[in-house]
Amino acid sequence: MAAKDVKFGNDARVKMLEGVNVLADAVKVTLGPKGRNVVLDKSFGAPTITKDGVSVAREIELEDKFQNMGAQMVKEVASKANDAAGDGTTTATVLAQAIVNEGLKAVAAGMNPMDLKRGIDKAVAAAVEQLKELSVECNDTKAIAQVGTISANSDASVGNIIAEAMERVGRDGVITVEEGQALQDELDVVEGMQFDRGYLSPYFINNQEAGSVELENPFILLVDKKISNIRELLPTLEAVAKASRPLLIIAEDVEGEALATLVVNNMRGIVKVAAVKAPGFGDRRKAMLQDIAILTGGTVISEEIGLELEKVTLEDLGQAKRVSITKENSTIIDGAGEEAMIQGRVAQIRQQIEDATSDYDKEKLQERVAKLAGGVAVIKVGAATEVEMKEKKDRVEDALHATRAAVEEGVVAGGGVALIRAASKIVDLEGDNEEQNVGIRVALRAMEAPIRQITKNAGDEDSVVANNVKAGEGSYGYNAATGEYGDMLEMGILDPTKVTRSALQFAASVAGLMITTEAMVTDLPQKESAGMPDMGGMGGMGGMGMM
């Protein structure tokens, strides 16, 4: 086991604080409408230019191991804020830096770190309650666009495209961000349920121009197994042919004789039919087949529950207004399922999302909710160069997370104003002893840090602005983009309550741990191993002459 280097007390805290400040100073220059860019060197390809706080934080590793521990702990603040709300990473970093700096001054002056932490926690809990009271619902498109604009560093086009996407697919719809091919941003919306499985044979195509299969008012047969024997399908095909309507078969697979017979029947016009593979794999496939069944009002034919393919009736089949199938995707539009059943299924999947532990599972479950409840929107980010594309895509993703958070918990006045107002309402809060009171004051002072940093980045005097805003009431604040004072809500400068709340809570949580640190342990650097020993002077080798 390698030898360790240990530092105690003030020596440890000073080193840790140096690391905190290096990382926070690099991140905080990005805060606000006039925040600066940070250029990140990459081991391959062009450097990345970003204004995304968490992207900057993730790149920072310091050579001094004690400093690096401090930096990594603040990095954790940014990552946690990003995971919880998807935005507010820079605000969280600025708050953590302020709490650590103020808190360690108090520790150096002889205060008890544990009581300081209790005071900080007490102030933060009270401030969070005040933020919830200040929160205003965010339901209309204009407010959503404003939140997106602020989060995308005052880029109105980003705010507008996100608001349009949310309006078209609903609050539960899935919105994804991709790199586009054009210079302008584009929005593609897929209504209905789309899954990534195309037609099993090109002979099903009936729209030659588009190269797709279009079925109007079809029956939909859902089967949880492979179909290779056509005899199993004959009763269904006969019933559908009598009804003079097309049929879509969604099964684990359709192969051999069964597929060949379907193709021949389709080409001869006996019955209009198409077949696709069921989406997903394993248990996820079973769940998605059940989703499609509920959406279309059908039943999944599965031997597990005693249903046989030969005994299928028209009542077992789902229905939809239209189905469109391309080489890669199938889309079911306007399924005939009952609304109450669909909502029940959505509620069930939402519960699974809450219980899920992995991000991948949550994402897949969220996609299923969207396919049942709304639709899927794809924002294609346009830019002139690859470097600009990466930077803009980061901003669009941040803005999207911010708008989702705003719809979830509402909005508060932006520009650091909400934290100032929350702090002013708990100024009389008292702890159990004087040291806890100092902790409360540390937290209250730290809550001014975001507005001060936004002002500094805009090139203005932070003390003047902070005092002017503190003298005001409600959503009165400072618009750093224009240099004007006024009502932040009316000016459209909004922050999602969830983002502000998460930033404060995570900053206080990690900063509290750092203030109460008394010792730090790290590996000693390994000494370089010595080279080969000199061979001169080895006994018995004197007679060896060099040529």
Swiss-Prot record:
The keyword GTP-binding does not apply. It catalyses: ATP + H2O + a folded polypeptide = ADP + phosphate + an unfolded polypeptide. Coiled coil: none annotated. Pfam families: Cpn60_TCP1 (PF00118). It is found in: Cytoplasm. Its main location: cytoplasm. Disulfide bonds: none annotated. Together with its co-chaperonin GroES, plays an essential role in assisting protein folding. The GroEL-GroES system forms a nano-cage that allows encapsulation of the non-native substrate proteins and provides a physical environment optimized to promote and accelerate protein folding. This is Chaperonin GroEL 1. It comes from Vibrio parahaemolyticus serotype O3:K6 (strain RIMD 2210633). The lineage of its organism: Bacteria, Pseudomonadati, Pseudomonadota, Gammaproteobacteria, Vibrionales.
